[in-house]
């Protein structure tokens, strides 16, 4: 940890203060000049800067300089494997629809990924996440070029950066039965490996691509290799092609099919859910299945706008926000999520409350179905995942309006300090414990090699 603080309870004390403190606790406490006391991996106390400095006079003090102190962001759905696609020009790539995007871009990319590509992608993506104030990442990985050991590569990258992460590998029939089985075993191996850790920093799920690339037999094989307490991370109805495939092959909607095979449940996370009907929403609600929306990605892929307001308000489905690999800055999903539903529904009142609830309340609640330490809140015994944002604003910030300040005034690039699990991972915009320039350099070198291979 950067700096040496006051030892108490077997750990070193750290204070982060002199800033407007957003706690997100049950009472929504907000301190104009607030401070967080960190003891080891958890929050010990929150209060005013004056009272906590008096209580812990020898603790290391990080000065927020009037900025905003708040819980770290959680990204509930990411695709780190897409990192090297930034700036990539693919030969013979002229997509006309989402299936073209999948087949001619993403499946082509993941077939070219090596273990080293995965590792370097992981390091730079986790680094970028930390720089954007993201302290927990749920990732959905694919690298059909080299499957076995790929989640270990991401795990190693996360450990080196000190970020909290939940990993899975997307099982699919698209490259044949042998690779499908290898993908299942990659999930099973990492589920076992993560269960042996006691640091609450890495968890695992059984990953699945989507219903239209998985037979019933493949889904059953996934289920047979998934222990109790572990759920599935799967894309549902991201495109109409998925819907039509299920109706044509199985005579039932996607969610009904997954329900019949026992895939839904409180530990399962469904990405997108754009083209689903009322009965499917009922099944998601009744099984407690989590849904993650990714508004920026949905617009970019031209796949439509999910009925998120209806799922949230009418059906009470637990819904969160992700980036789907589009960016590592979760505030972008907040901003786009706010406007896409207003535009889609032609309703200027839509999404004002729902989207911030997804980001600040539901993302932590969903993440805590896997991680034991309470996330997304600054209160005693919660995870010491804290960020400082260099934001001051032209108008007063209060407990009633700070979500509007975040929405209209903040972005990930304003984050100056990131603390994860009580460890300072970024201080004054410098990521700690690694050679940041080397990480960027190694990633760019590896990306150039990857670009040549993917275009061969």
Q: What do the PLM-derived regions correspond to, one by one?
A:
Residues 19, 36, 41, 66, ...:
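Divalent metal-coordination and catalytic microenvironments
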Residues 5-34, 39-44, 49, 55, ...:
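Active-site microenvironment of metallo-dependent hydrolases
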Residues 286-317:
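A conserved active-site cap/scaffold subdomain adjacent to cofactor or substrate pockets
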Residues 84-118, 175-176, 240-267, 287-290, ...:
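Active-site gating loops and adjacent loop-to-helix segments of metal-dependent hydrolytic enzymes
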Residues 88-140, 145-163, 185-197, 444-446, ...:
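Alpha-helical scaffold segments that flank or form the walls of functional sites
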Residues 261-263, 267, 307-393, 409-411:
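His/Asp/Glu-enriched, well-ordered alpha-helical/loop segment
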Residues 141-273:
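Metal-coordinating catalytic core of metallo-dependent amide/deamination hydrolases
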């Amino acid at each position: 940890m950067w700096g040496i603080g006051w030892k108490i309870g077997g750990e070193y004390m750290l204070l982060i203060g002199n800033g407007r403190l957003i706690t997100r606790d049950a009472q929504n406490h907000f301190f104009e000049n607030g401070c967080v006391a960190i003891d080891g991996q958890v929050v010990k106390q929150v209060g005013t800067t004056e009272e906590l400095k008096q209580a812990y006079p020898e603790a290391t003090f990080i000065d927020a300089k009037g900025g905003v102190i708040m819980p770290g962001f959680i990204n509930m759905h990411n695709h780190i494997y897409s990192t090297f696609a930034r700036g990539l020009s693919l030969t013979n790539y002229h997509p006309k629809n989402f299936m073209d995007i999948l087949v001619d871009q993403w499946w082509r990319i993941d077939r070219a990924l090596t273990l080293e590509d995965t590792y370097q992608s992981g390091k730079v993506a986790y680094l970028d996440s930390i720089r954007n104030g993201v302290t927990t990442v749920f990732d959905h990985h694919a690298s059909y070029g080299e499957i076995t050991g790929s989640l270990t590569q991401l795990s190693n990258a996360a450990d080196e950066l000190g970020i909290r992460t939940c990993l899975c590998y997307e099982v699919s029939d698209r490259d044949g039965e042998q690779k499908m089985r290898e993908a299942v075993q990659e999930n099973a191996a990492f589920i076992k490996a993560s269960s042996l850790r006691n640091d609450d920093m890495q968890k695992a799920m059984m990953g699945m691509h989507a219903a239209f690339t998985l037979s019933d037999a493949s889904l059953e094989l996934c289920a047979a290799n998934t222990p109790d307490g572990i759920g599935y991370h799967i894309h549902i109805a991201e495109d109409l092609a998925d819907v039509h495939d299920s109706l044509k092959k199985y005579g039932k909607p996607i969610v009904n099919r997954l329900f019949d095979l026992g895939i839904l449940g409180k530990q399962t996370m469904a990405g997108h859910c754009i083209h689903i009907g009322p009965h499917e929403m009922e099944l998601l609600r009744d099984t407690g299945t989590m849904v993650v929306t990714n508004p920026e990605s949905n617009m970019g892929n031209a796949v439509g706008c999910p009925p998120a307001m209806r799922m949230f308000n009418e059906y009470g489905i637990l819904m969160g926000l992700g980036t789907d690999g589009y960016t590592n800055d979760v505030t972008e999903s907040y901003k786009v999520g706010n406007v896409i539903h207003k535009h889609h529904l032609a309703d200027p009142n839509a999404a004002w409350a729902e989207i911030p609830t997804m980001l600040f309340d539901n993302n932590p609640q969903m993440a805590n179905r896997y991680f034991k330490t309470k996330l997304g809140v600054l209160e005693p015994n919660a995870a010491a995942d804290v960020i400082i944002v260099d934001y001051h604003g032209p108008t007063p910030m209060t407990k009633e309006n700070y979500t509007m300040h975040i929405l209209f005034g903040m972005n990930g690039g304003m984050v100056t300090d990131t603390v994860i699990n009580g460890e300072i991972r970024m201080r004054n915009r410098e990521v700690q414990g690694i050679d940041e320039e080397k990480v960027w350099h190694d990633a760019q070198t590896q990306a150039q090699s990857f670009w040549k291979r993917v275009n061969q």
